[in-house]
């Protein structure tokens, strides 16, 4: 039923309806959190008070030793002022020619 109402109202009406419902859910969420904090269920009976053991934490994984001498990407440190130009020249032979429209380009 709600979906058919939203479809009839259009975008603005649907947005307005969603905002109103969001306010209702916010109010409901605060009520639920208060009832959960009180320690009683909805019927007024105390909740099951059995002691639960805290969740066990997994054993910490030992960290791997950090070793800079085994770095494999050596070209990463091989930059110079002309690195980009060298690569540009190297890759230019693989570039495809740009298509032409058939007319001359404008002179600037």
UniProtKB/Swiss-Prot annotation:
Subcellular location: Mitochondrion inner membrane
Pfam family, one: NDUFV3
Region of interest (Disordered), ranges: 33-72
Entry membrane topology: Peripheral membrane protein
Modified residues annotated as Phosphoserine in this record: 105
Presence of the UniProt keyword Transit peptide in the record: yes
Main location: mitochondrion
Keywords: Electron transport, Membrane, Mitochondrion, Mitochondrion inner membrane, Phosphoprotein, Respiratory chain, Transit peptide, Transport
Transit peptide as recorded in UniProt: 1-34
GO biological process, one term: mitochondrial ATP synthesis coupled electron transport
GO CC annotations, alphabetized: mitochondrial inner membrane; respiratory chain complex I
InterPro entries assigned: NDUFV3
Protein name, per record: NADH dehydrogenase [ubiquinone] flavoprotein 3, mitochondrial
